[in-house]
Amino acid sequence: MARTTKPEKRKKTIPYNFGDKHKAYIRKSQDCMINVAEGAVRAGKTVDNVLAFCHELKTTKDKIHLASASTLGNAKIILGNCNGFGIEHFFRGQCRWGKYKGNEALIIKGKDTGFKTRIVIFSGAMLASSYKSIRGNSYGMWIGTEINLHHKSFVQEAFNRSIAADKRKIWWDLNPDNPKSWIYTEYIDKYQQDAADCKFLGGYNYAHFTIDDNINISDQRKAEVKSQYDPTSIWYKRDILGLRIAAEGLIFQSFANDPEKYIIPESQLDKSKILSLIHISSPRDVEESRM
């Protein structure tokens, strides 16, 4: 008699560990409308937001919700899958990918939602026209990854689309950008200041993370990753330290680091000899230098 294989039972937990700093951020998000996780790469920011979003999704009365990234594909990979820790894995056995009124969606219904249908619409947000894909819908909660890569019009439209939500909650994550970026001046830093002045209603939750805050990565691997960077480079400051840097595209890094070393006071210049120090290459000079 052929032996039948029993279906694999759903495991109760997903094997992921959260450090104290991450736990504090997730815990605080329960009481805050806007939640922002910023910092270095591989710091665990996205997993925090996905977990918090899914936890709230179980009890929200709103049916339709939004998940966005720079492109639709990125939204499905980063938020839907998230290396095995995404929304589809949180609701494993209780969800399916499909379409909802023409939109890419994860349709959830099971024990975790009280057998009520909850729909997460996935959308790209990078283009100037991306906002059109979410017009006409009303959303409850919104989770956006790499929010600094979203177009401004999409961000504003997403806010407008959630005004009538029963549980209006938003989660963003991002790697550091130029300090003058609109996402800081118009939203993140503005909210931070308003919260400090007790002017922000609904609760604001901000946390900064680095790879050292991710306890799922071994110390040896962290050391290996750091060793691949020049500690003086903007990439180290941005990717490892999680700092906002405006120097991207800088050609003369040595000059920027120590300009005084290369500056000659005007009082020491012999202006009659300045022109002798300047050589302007002609196209012929450039061509001959290549021969």
State where each predicted segment sits.
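Pre-P-loop entry segment of helicase/translocase ATPase cores
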Residues: 1-33
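Conserved P-loop
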Residues: 34-98
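Residue-level preference for the first positions of well-ordered beta-strands
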Residues: 34-36, 64-66, 119-120, 141, ...
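Inter-Walker segment of RecA-like/P-loop motor cores
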Residues: 81-138
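ASCE P-loop NTPase helicase motor core
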Residues: 141, 149-229
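ATPase catalytic-site recognition across NTP-hydrolyzing enzymes
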Residues: 215-276
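Conserved small/polar residues in nucleotide/adenosyl-binding loops
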Residues: 278-285
